[in-house]
Amino acid sequence: MKLYHGSHVEVRNPKILTSSRVGDFGSGFYTTSSMKQALRWAEIRAQQTKSASGVVTVFEVPDSLFEHPELAVKTFSQADDDWLDFVLANRQDTAFEHHFDLVRGPVANDRVYVCLNALENGTADRATVLRRLKTFVLADQIFFHTAKSLLFLEYVSTEVVPCSKP
């Protein structure tokens, strides 16, 4: 199975990096099975860093990756109650830790962030946010949280993506 990582730099040898900006599933290495989503991430990162181009790095993983007996895997099939709890814990609770090697599920896009921010600042309740989330078609993200999980990523290629100026 091919996975894509969008950034402003090529990433041949991914690492688990901690950041002050924690993603939906925590600190780690984010990929997607959607080239379209990776292209979007690459353009966003290029604009954030004022780079002329973004980069999509392509990886291959075994088709059976999510069933591997030595990996702790969490799968969210949709943006539901459990997904919302997990994402909010990662966003809000600096002490929150999970012990999954891999997490896969919907990626929070701009529309989802508007909903999450509304929930966090009290302008929308949980039921309203969950109802809105059900109407969104969301790309996936496959998150590598441990060094052990990164061993399954095999570098394939890199695509440089010219980006429009903001």
Language-model regions, residue ranges each:
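Glycine-rich loop/turn
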Residues: 1-29, 37-47
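Conserved NAD+-utilizing ADP-ribose enzyme module
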Residues: 23-24, 40, 44-166
